[in-house]
């Protein structure tokens, strides 16, 4: 059986303890078999349609870019069951786990969206579920913690390190090392050791496939650019995958600039990091001069990650995609605008992509351009965070 390529240019690979290599080999083997199995593909497709609610809408905005010549569409992953794009690939991986005879699922989560998606898939497919979550994130994402528990998941707060996503990732890998015979590690983004970046991309690529069909039906042409936020990079690679060969379409990823790149408090390793080994892969990393992992920071827990998926690093290196950044304040402004102008409450993660799209529209009001933003999730989970910030600013 042919194997998948473990690298994207110089990025990717499989830097894990020897004990995990058989588990990763088994995962790759089963994934390749599943991709050629019509019954697996049919079951996945049915779950996406009947349970998750695909295809999701492509919504043309009415008011937010009204005084410009930009046409702005939103790919509505916020309407997916579970509230974000995460549900897509989680259903795929959970089906794979069942196929491998695994009865338990281990996951990590930042904003809690991946945890919620994993919990709902495990409830549906009768799998035992435990989710590692940084203690800080447990505090700032209490609604999602409760959702996970309601669906039968065990949520394990991680107090080590910065008590955020990277520490939850480390604990999840530790657990998997001890239990890989009976448990599948359901990784939440298009990063980590091979074959995860490829598996997650393939289980998210319907985002871009649907977008392409929908925009051609609505506008009769491809967009000038597709724009998505980038933390680990799964919603972005899901949007980009089907457009990579369409060279007329700009691929724009938006990293979190946090309090400003110059402050060091950000999560933008693609443009402002150095290549290193982290989380089982070779990828751009936020690290200090000693090579220690630096703390990443973002207003949105889901983008608060010090590295990024290897395919994004490769797309940047070969010049196929470009990567910008948006600050906390820019994301907040975009969040508020979408609420007030379109009646849609976006996730703070997705608000970073929206902020950059609005910048393109407002800075060139006379430029005719067709833009699509991947609205990767809804903002219910963020309303308390936003409320507290606006109250502090005297805007409430």
From Swiss-Prot:
Cofactors: pyridoxal 5'-phosphate
Record keywords: Amino-acid biosynthesis, Aromatic amino acid biosynthesis, Lyase, Pyridoxal phosphate, Tryptophan biosynthesis
Residues bearing the modification N6-(pyridoxal phosphate)lysine: 86
Coiled coil segments of this chain: none
InterPro entries: Trp_synth_b_CS, Trp_synth_beta, Trp_synth_beta/beta-like, TrpB-like_PALP, TrpB-like_PALP_sf
Reaction(s) catalysed by this chain's protein: (1S,2R)-1-C-(indol-3-yl)glycerol 3-phosphate + L-serine = D-glyceraldehyde 3-phosphate + L-tryptophan + H2O
An annotated GO cellular component: cytoplasm
Enzyme class: lyase
EC number: 4.2.1.20
Regions crossing the membrane: none
GO molecular function annotations of the record: tryptophan synthase activity
Family membership: Belongs to the TrpB family.
Subunit structure: Tetramer of two alpha and two beta chains.
Function: The beta subunit is responsible for the synthesis of L-tryptophan from indole and L-serine.
Name of the molecule in the record: Tryptophan synthase beta chain
Taxonomic source organism: Francisella philomiragia subsp. philomiragia (strain ATCC 25017 / CCUG 19701 / FSC 153 / O#319-036)
Lineage: Bacteria, Pseudomonadati, Pseudomonadota, Gammaproteobacteria, Thiotrichales
Gene it is expressed from: trpB
């Amino acid at each position: 059986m042919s194997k998948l390529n473990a690298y994207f240019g110089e990025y990717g690979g499989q830097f894990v303890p020897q004990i995990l290599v058989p588990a990763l080999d088994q995962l790759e083997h089963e994934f390749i078999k599943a991709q050629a199995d019509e019954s697996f593909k049919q079951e996945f497709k049915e779950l996406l349609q009947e349970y998750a609610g695909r295809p999701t809408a492509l919504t043309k905005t009415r008011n937010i870019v009204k005084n410009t010549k930009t046409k702005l569409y939103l790919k509505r992953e916020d309407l997916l069951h579970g509230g974000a794009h995460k549900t897509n690939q989680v259903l795929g991986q959970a089906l794979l786990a069942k196929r491998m005879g695994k009865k338990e699922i281990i996951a990590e989560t930042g904003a809690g969206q991946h945890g919620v998606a994993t919990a709902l898939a495990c409830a549906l497919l009768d799998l035992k579920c435990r989710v590692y979550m940084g203690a800080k994130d447990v505090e700032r994402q209490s609604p999602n913690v409760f959702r996970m528990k309601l669906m039968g998941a065990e949520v394990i707060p991680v107090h080590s390190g910065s008590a955020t996503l990277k520490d939850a990732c480390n604990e999840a890998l530790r657990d998997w090392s001890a239990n890989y015979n009976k448990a599948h590690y359901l990784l939440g983004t298009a990063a980590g050791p091979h074959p995860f970046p490829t598996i997650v991309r393939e289980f998210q690529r319907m985002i871009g496939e649907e977008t392409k069909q929908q925009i051609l039906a609505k506008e009769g042409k491809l967009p000038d650019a597709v724009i998505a936020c980038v933390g680990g990079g799964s919603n972005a690679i899901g949007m980009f995958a089907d457009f990579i060969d369409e060279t007329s379409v700009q691929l724009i990823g938006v990293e979190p600039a946090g309090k400003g790149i110059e402050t060091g408090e950000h999560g933008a390793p693609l443009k402002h990091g150095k290549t290193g080994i982290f989380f089982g892969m070779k990828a751009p990393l936020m690290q200090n001069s000693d090579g220690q992992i630096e703390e990443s920071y973002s207003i949105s827990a889901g983008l608060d990650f010090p590295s990024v998926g290897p395919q994004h690093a490769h797309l940047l290196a070969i010049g196929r995609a470009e990567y910008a950044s948006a600050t906390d304040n820019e994301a907040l402004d975009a969040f508020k605008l979408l609420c007030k102008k379109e009646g849609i409450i976006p996730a703070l993660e997705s608000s970073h992509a929206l902020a950059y799209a609005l910048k393109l529209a407002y800075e060139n009001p006379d430029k005719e351009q067709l833009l699509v933003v991947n609205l990767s999730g809804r903002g219910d989970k963020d309303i308390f965070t936003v409320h507290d910030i606006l109250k502090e600013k005297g805007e409430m």
